Amino acid sequence: TVFFQPERQGKTAAMNRGMKLVDTPIVVFTDANTMVNRQAIREIVLAFEDPRVGCVAGEKRIAVQAKDNAASGGEGIYWRYESTLKALDARLYSAVGAAGELFAVRRELFAEMERDTLLDDFVLSLRIAMQGYIIAYCTEAYAIESGSADMREEEKRKVRIAAGGLQSIWRL
């Protein structure tokens, strides 16, 4: 289902608005520029069979072509490393946060976020973990995105993530 709103208010506002209109027990979020594998939704739903699971994080993969630049290549290496850490964390108990490219939550655990939230995926998933639920990590559900077009774009992305990290510390 698509819920149209003519004015842009940001992703967090869209999530807050959309969640008021959803009646399914599980809600899956992706980024607009993300492609997911065919079995992703099925694999995510299976992870929710464990009642301790409140959020399921999919794996982020970067599509790197031979013609791509160093920014894309470096981003791909970073996400392979990050994915390994998330999988190890989840094996011990719970992943720490979810990436916005592909994650899902139990609808009843969603709490409206501040409209200016920079890292909605991280804040939402950690708030669910703070309620005592596990963030499962599902490597069989993955999202594929293109890497940063150039180093300037990658720098802007990193600055936004750093600012969002600081904002998250204050809010959590």
Task: Describe the role of every protein-language-model region.
Residues 1:
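Short loop->beta transition adjacent to catalytic acidic/histidine clusters or analogous donor-positioning motifs
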Residues 4, 12-14, 20, 24, ...:
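Long helical/loop segments within the catalytic core of UDP-sugar-dependent glycosyltransferases
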Residues 8:
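Walker A (P-loop) phosphate-binding loop of P-loop NTPases
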Residues 13, 17, 29, 43, ...:
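Residues within well-formed alpha-helices
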Residues 15, 38-41, 148-151, 155:
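Conserved strand-to-helix beginnings and helix N-cap segments that scaffold or border functional pockets
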Residues 33:
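Nucleotide-activated sugar donor-binding and catalytic core shared by glycosyltransferases
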Residues 48-82, 116-120, 125-172:
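Catalytic donor/gating beta->alpha subdomain of glycosyltransferases that bind UDP-sugars
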